[in-house]
Amino acid sequence: DYHLLDTASELKRTGTSTNIGFFLHIPFPPLDIFAKLPWRAEILQSMLDYDLIGFQTLRDRRNFIQCLRTFIDDVSIEGKGQVLSARAGDRSIRIGYFPISIDYDEFSQMAGSKEVADAAWYIHEDIPKGKIVLGVDRLDYTKGIPYRLRAFESFLEKHPELHRKITLVQVVVPSRRDIPVYEDLKIEIEQLVGEINGRFTRSGWVPIHYIFRSLTRPELLGYYRTAEIALITPLKDGMNLVAKEYCASNTEQTGALILSEFAGTAPQLKKGAILVNPYNIEEVSEAIYSAWSMDIRERRTRMKRMQGTVAKHDIYWWVNSYLKASTAGNLDDFPPVGYIEPV
């Protein structure tokens, strides 16, 4: 997304006079990181040529505003809701945060289909005993997969009584294989899987099932339905829709979600998910045990909360709120901070 930060400036140089909006899907860096860029002021000045800038989270918007106040002269900020107004010289733009989402109804309905039920049956045939812990990520260093594998290894070390009663299914979707660092990451992941399976595998039980390919939609939803625990622990993520997809597809409402506090989804789902620091291997290990031992009533209570949040703030809400921000006449038309994601 950062490739498009100065697109508005380029468009206006060509004579474009219509309003231009921009949405940043990735996190906006905090001041101490952004300050290191040689072109920091130029980037911010270019972004001020947009009429509306949208971010995923309140934290991202705060980071951007802090950078504006530090590197752009005479900036004033008005408003205190979901959408603010920023003035710098003769420019006035709107800055909002709009957590992107999914089509909740589509996932929920498809998860209840016969096709997905058949996929779930085959998964149960392949992993007939114990609970399934699911990780689904594209191949990327930001996803924290090696940390996650180490956390699962720690869990197995601490809880030998649960061997044969729990299995981690780690799906890795191929990405950027032509870049050496990604190929190195793949090798690291596969070596870790091999080491852990080598230590703990017993007759009739392999602790980690590693899948390196893209899944079809029915396959993916089949895993969402069968997994009692979703382990979503990116080191940093703009949003992470896997967490929302898992909630929408959990038709029995018995799943537990372990979620990185550094995922953009965390503020929205924190009342139902078990939040963890993905760098803290022991904390994630303990979270796996907490999720494994959680009683069914608490699972349902937590999942219902998360499903309600995702259903209310779905992809159509995201589109409508962004479009409203570009056309509404008054900042008071927008909900106060905390309505979308508690702070």
Q: Model-derived features: where do they sit?
A:
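Catalytic cores of carbohydrate-active enzymes across secretory and cytosolic contexts
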Residues: 1-343
